Amino acid sequence: SGFIVTTEVFRCREVIESYAPAQRNFHDQITQHLRRLEQATGKAFGDPANPLLLSVRSGASISQPGMMDTLLDVGNNLEITAGVAARTGNAWFAWDNYRRFLQNYGMAHDMSRDDFDAVIAEFKNRLGIPLKRHFSGDQMREVALAYRRLIEEAGVEVIDSPFEQLLLAIRRVLASWESPRAQAYRRIMGISDDWGTAIAIQAMVYGNRSPQAGTGVIFTHNPRWAGDVLKLWGDFTTANQGEDVVSGLVNTMPISLFQQEIEMRETDVTLETHFPEIYQELKRWAHTLIDDHGWSPQEIEFTFEGASAADLYMLQTRDMAIRESQKVLAFDFEEPPIARLLGHGIGVSGGAMSGRLVFTLDEIKAWRAREPETRLILVRTDTVPDDIREINAADGLLTARGGLTSHAAV
């Protein structure tokens, strides 16, 4: 459930910001749509006893994955978080939501993801806990409060009013159209700067609610193989929210047994085996979109709050990016083979590549000038939208985290 702020708001944003009657009209329309959303969900925006939290994300006519801001868990504050903890009996879940909101909020104010990663890494090291899902509720509360202090120490005011948060989130998403990374992406992809973006405002659903909840992305067709056979392929993870998967920040698990076998994944967990109802419902929806409605192959982002089909939610869908095949001489077969296997991972585009490892844009430029024929492979722990220039300049990408449905991969 949700509503759309159209591109007309983007085009008229200066008038809305500067002309009081236009601003009041816009606020009134947002309030009206919030009331309808409250009726549809049975929750109340800003009510600590039964809060409606929102996701606020861009929606341009041509997808620009990860280039513009997304704010999740909007409408949250300390009082509401305490209310969620009391209502659900799950303090970890409540404080994880607030932690995520604060990180999105800080990054929308130009703070670095690395700053927040350093905070949670320090907690993990000090407590001897390798994964955040193993924190207690009180420990997650301390992490969230540390995030808030980090933001305030950076000179950024944390707004507690849910409605003011929503208005700020809308402004930030609109402004992110002009961000350097979004402009760079549009130049690379040949997208006009004049189109602007709409905004999708949706009720939050929670893949981080429990170990039986999760989130993921599926392709309706194998992205590596030609043909139009409908076969689900993609990534999912449990006890996380959607941005974790598409941002490439977590290690993911395969959708099907067939995918697990083909990719030689070192996990026994697949969506098909561990969440069969979710898998079958996704398959049913894929057949409905492709076979019944004649859509092109789709990339579908989903979240499930439990193991039954009724717990599944579709967050968004878009046409799959179809990659062109290209023959590349990857290896010199006259050279002796490598003595031992150094590691293996998940291939995204199929085939193979060899080349020189690089780590920065300056390094890429230097090797392009020195050896223009040498293929360059960018190495990252994970990828974030600000890496778009490096990714575009390199020939290949190797990351320690993330899956084939992350923004960098697609």
Protein language model features and the residues they cover:
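Hydrophobic, helix-rich cores of sensory/ligand-binding and other regulatory modules
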Residues: 360-363
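Nucleotide/phosphate-binding sheet-loop regions of phosphoryl- and nucleotidyl-transfer enzymes
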Residues: 1-350, 354, 365-377, 381-389, ...
